[in-house]
Amino acid sequence: MRSAQVYRWQIPMDAGVVLRDRRLKTRDGLYVCLRDGEREGWGEISPLPGFSQETWEEAQTALLTWVNDWLQGSEGLPEMPSVAFGASCALAELTGVLPEAADYRAAPLCTGDPDDLVLRLADMPGEKIAKVKVGLYEAVRDGMVVNLLLEAIPDLHLRLDANRAWTPLKAQQFAKYVNPDYRARIAFLEEPCKTRDDSRAFARETGIAIAWDESLREADFTFEAEEGVKAVVIKPTLTGSLDKVREQVAAAHALGLTVVISSSIESSLGLTQLARIAAWLTPGTLPGLDTLHLMQAQQVRPWPGSALPCLKRDELERLL
């Protein structure tokens, strides 16, 4: 016997979270909980403002329609990426397809004073991989900060993310301030320039490896082995169903590319599922899931070791 609940939620964000020039004051989303007999599966649907094509309200309408169809015996999935991902996760939990084993390691997202970062990163146990957002300030400053971190910590590797912020000139200004001897320890730089051709040229000219992120969600993108392209970053909330995520991971791995499963600032429930997906599909690769600290609370399932308060399901607004 099938049954389902849908919950709507809103989590206050820490001050200072800015996405594509807009301040994100709250993270808004939905949960779906599917039941079939004794089995239960959860999924999170939380379109990311400025990145997802669908709004929270559109996702809610699509989810409620899909849940009602599922209760009537339908086996299809919604079209909207965030809804398809959340629904497919709930089904994967319900059927036991999604393994329980999780990779709760996360490449720390580095913000703040560079001198403080050096101290923090130097004390990191094990493999030292960290992420730095670039393109928010002057390219020269970004280059100097990256160079400082790599110089101060000889075993540090950095993942950088520019979100297509730079013109070719700005990208070259960044590279100019990174010692060529350190560039191999830039694991990759996500989407440095506004176009893929400019990003490819940057990789060729500087020897700094790049990764595709936004490009994966463009209609003309195909997986190819290319000079200077080392990785792809997959954000499942923006991608679609779990099957589509698996297809992209397989296509990238077949070309020898590194695949990083990455957060779209999901709640703790969504992040714990992404940790399981990473352990399952990209074992041995550190996922990019260090975003929980941007929020003021957890929900339903806590992230191991987090001190943030965790709301129970009965504290959420139920829609169905």
Swiss-Prot record:
Function field: Converts 2-succinyl-6-hydroxy-2,4-cyclohexadiene-1-carboxylate (SHCHC) to 2-succinylbenzoate (OSB).
Pathway given in the UniProt record: Quinol/quinone metabolism; 1,4-dihydroxy-2-naphthoate biosynthesis; 1,4-dihydroxy-2-naphthoate from chorismate: step 4/7; Quinol/quinone metabolism; menaquinone biosynthesis
Secreted keyword on record: no
Taxonomic source organism: Salmonella dublin (strain CT_02021853)
Gene Ontology terms for molecular function: magnesium ion binding; O-succinylbenzoate synthase activity
Cofactor requirement: a divalent metal cation
InterPro entries in the record: Enolase-like_C_sf, Enolase-like_N, Enolase_C-like, Mandelate_racemase_C, OSB_synthase_MenC1, OSBS_N
Record has Cytoplasm as a keyword: no
GO BP: menaquinone biosynthetic process
E.C. designation(s): 4.2.1.113
SMART domains: MR_MLE (SM00922)
Binding annotation for Mg(2+): 161, 190, 213
PANTHER family in the record: O-SUCCINYLBENZOATE SYNTHASE, O-SUCCINYLBENZOATE SYNTHASE-RELATED
SUPFAM superfamilies: Enolase C-terminal domain-like, Enolase N-terminal domain-like
Active site as annotated: 133 (proton donor), 235 (proton acceptor)
Keywords carried by this UniProt record: Lyase, Magnesium, Menaquinone biosynthesis, Metal-binding
Superkingdom classification of source: Bacteria
Family statement drawn from the similarity comment of this UniProt entry: Belongs to the mandelate racemase/muconate lactonizing enzyme family. MenC type 1 subfamily.
Full protein name: o-succinylbenzoate synthase
EC main group: lyase
Catalytic activity: (1R,6R)-6-hydroxy-2-succinyl-cyclohexa-2,4-diene-1-carboxylate = 2-succinylbenzoate + H2O
Gene name linked to the record: menC
